[in-house]
A protein has these predicted regions:
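Short glycine-rich, polar/acidic loop-and-turn segments at beta strand-coil junctions
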Residues: 57-60, 240, 261, 272
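Conserved short strand/loop->alpha-helix "switch" segment adjacent to the catalytic nucleotide/phosphoryl-transfer site
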Residues: 213-241, 290
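Conserved beta-strand-loop-beta-strand hairpin that lines the nucleotide-binding pocket
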Residues: 193-196, 202, 245-324
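A short beta-loop-alpha structural element at the N-terminal edge
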Residues: 206-212
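Short aromatic/hydrophobic contact patches that present stacked aromatics
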Residues: 27, 237, 316-318
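Non-catalytic regulatory/interaction regions at protein termini and inter-domain linkers
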Residues: 1-202, 206, 217, 225, ...
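Amphipathic alpha-helical segments that form the core helices of the histone-fold
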Residues: 44, 240-244
Length: 324
């Protein structure tokens, strides 16, 4: 099993006054004692500096943290990460909103978006979004994010990936620089690679601009057969419609929809001949002066997981929606 010492080398123990912008570091911890030791010190620094701090972890971590903080817990905001970050594409917008709520002030965050029990697909997307955090926030406002990794519950692949996506690693009460960090220009593109093939034979439906209405009907009927309730079925219809509309507008006038089921999860994938080049597409809240990305923003809000792969030969967007 890798440890933090395998991934880092000496650096200053704390952020100098000259350092500005986004400080993205990981904390490898073992057991509840390790979790509390690392997070309490980080939060105490924020409270001492009167910096707003948001802790986004699982509910099982919140209770011991609150108990250890005592009265200082009232000075900390908490979010349930399995709800907030079920789809990791919601995390960058959530942190951006936290920054906006405290405009002009340094802030801190504690995040555990990668936890034991995440599916392989979820872990892959979490790792991609951890890298995108650097692109989204580097060179911007001053804030620090401490990302937690459970050495007892995560495999070596997840631990290694953390070193590639985080420039700093918490160590001995300070931090070290990650020797394996891949900065801009070195990290793989956010949409590189291929999705694994469907786990079962999918239903395939070709579509063009004239087919969007019957396509919605087809998806609604299929979702009902997949045991989605009315509200979740409509979420799936909305997501597929947004993706298909994007294919019509930007992907060559049409595309191919694949639908299948994996356990309790309904899967839909839209393929077309377009290429997605904006790495943060769908990760910014739409505004009247920035209408682009609205479709993928909506898809990210209503789906449990969204996977995007794109190259010159075309794009594929796969969405997951659990039936329970």
């Amino acid at each position: 099993m890798l440890s933090s010492s395998d991934l880092c080398h000496d650096a200053p123990s704390d952020v100098s006054d000259a350092e500005r912008g986004f400080h993205h570091q990981t904390l490898f911890y073992a057991g509840e004692a390790g979790f509390l030791r690392g997070t309490l010190a980080f939060i105490a620094e924020a409270i001492s500096a009167e910096e707003p701090v948001l802790v986004a972890v699982g509910s099982m971590r919140v209770a011991p943290l609150r108990d250890s903080l005592g009265v200082d817990a009232e000075r900390v905001s908490f979010a349930d990460m399995p709800v907030l970050g079920r789809n990791p594409a919601r995390l960058i917008p959530a942190w951006r909103q936290f920054l906006d709520e405290h405009e002009g002030r340094p802030v801190r965050g504690v995040s555990e978006s990668i936890w034991p029990g995440r599916s392989a697909a979820e872990l892959t997307e979490c790792e991609r979004h951890e890298s995108l955090m650097n692109l989204a926030f580097d060179g911007g406002r001053t804030w620090r994010l401490l990302c937690l990794y459970d050495l007892d519950g995560l495999d070596e692949q997840a631990i290694s990936a953390a070193g590639r996506s985080h420039p700093f690693i918490a160590h001995n009460g300070g931090y070290r620089r990650s020797e394996t960090y891949l900065g801009e220009g070195d990290a793989p593109g956010p949409f590189e690679g291929a999705l694994p093939p469907p786990a079962s034979s999918p239903t395939e439906v070709s579509f063009s601009g004239a087919d969007l209405t019957p396509l919605r009907v087809r998806v609604r009927e299929w979702a009902a057969g997949g045991l989605l309730d009315g509200e979740r079925a409509e979420r799936l219809v909305l997501a597929v419609n947004e993706l298909a509309t994007n294919s019509v507008r930007h992907g060559g006038g049409g595309g191919l929809l694949l639908m299948w089921r994996e356990g309790e999860t309904l899967m839909c994938e839209v393929r077309d001949l377009g290429q997605i080049e904006e790495p943060l597409v769908g990760l910014r809240r739409p505004s009247p002066d920035r209408p682009s990305g609205r479709g993928l923003w909506l898809v990210n809000q209503v789906c449990d997981l969204v996977q995007i792969r794109s190259a010159r030969t075309g794009s594929a967007v796969r969405i997951h929606l659990r039936s329970v």
